Amino acid sequence: MILYFINLMRKRNLFCVYLILLSTAINAQTNTFKVMAWNILHGANDIKNGKENVVRIIKEIDPDVVLMVETYGSGPFIANSLGYNFHLIASEETALDDPSTNLSIYSKHPFGKRIDTKYPFYLGGIEILINGKKIRFFSNWFHYLPWNDAPEKMGKSVEELLEWEKSEHKYNMIQKVLPYLKKYGAETDSIPMIFGGDMNTLSHKDWGNKTKKLHNNLVVPWNSTKILENLGLIDSYRKENPNPITHPGITWDNKKRNDSHRIDYIFYKGKSIKSTNSESYMSFFNEPIFINGKEIIYPSDHGFVVTSFKFK
């Protein structure tokens, strides 16, 4: 009888240990989440099986949230194939497979309130509840103009480059959406925000003293990213990879000319979240990319960024 009770207590203790370990694993899992930002190029319709390859790539990355650019009607297929919730950044009456709609958001987690703007082609968002905690997510695209493959070779001073940057569509777009970013950025003590996508801009974080020898001795505080930093938003990739020499984070390249740049980003702000890791992935259009040992033909001309976060 004594041995019976001893064995019973041992089993109970082992069961308790198992429950504790299981609870710890579940809490650790739900306390972290992964975000991916990707411009898939024309809805991934420019190569055979392009949408299917987008799905395969996202499955290998396994993000909790995807901030997508150039959706162009492919969203429902991608979301249904992944089993993700899907939010199209457009007016509510817009068909989910509308071929003219640019931005979208995908999530493993439930959606909250929509975040509509007057400029849905280049900014919009939605609340997402991760482990019951609300985060505001924004997908973004800015125009590429003005653009130069090598601004350091334009013969301009720093001041002239900053004025050149303001000369066309991109700067005007940023100014239009700035009130939204200020509004939601001011509320991040209670509701954090994550902003990501294709900004089509160089970063002042990549044009500092460490890289000036690469840039004709120019240190350029590019307006587009500096504006976000001034709002308190953190460039997650550069935070986790502070050396732009060893980790350039290239997401835009061209085989025919010297045009390698980091132009796709995930920014964040909030007291309750912090980034823990960030990676960039890059391949050329219609060429293989290797993820987790699997070869997939790449459907886009942009690389993508993946950042892991945790709740504090």
Where are the regions that the model predicts?
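Structural recognition of the beta-strand scaffold that forms the well-ordered cores
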Residues: K34-A37, V65-V69, S104-I105, R136-S139, ...
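Stable alpha-helical elements in mature extracytoplasmic
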Residues: G50-V54, T71-I78, N102, K170-Y180, ...
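Metal-dependent phosphoester-hydrolase catalytic domains
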Residues: T117, K183-M193, N200-K312
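A solvent-exposed, charged loop/short amphipathic helix patch at secondary-structure junctions
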Residues: N148-E168
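A long, amphipathic alpha-helix that forms part
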Residues: E163-D189
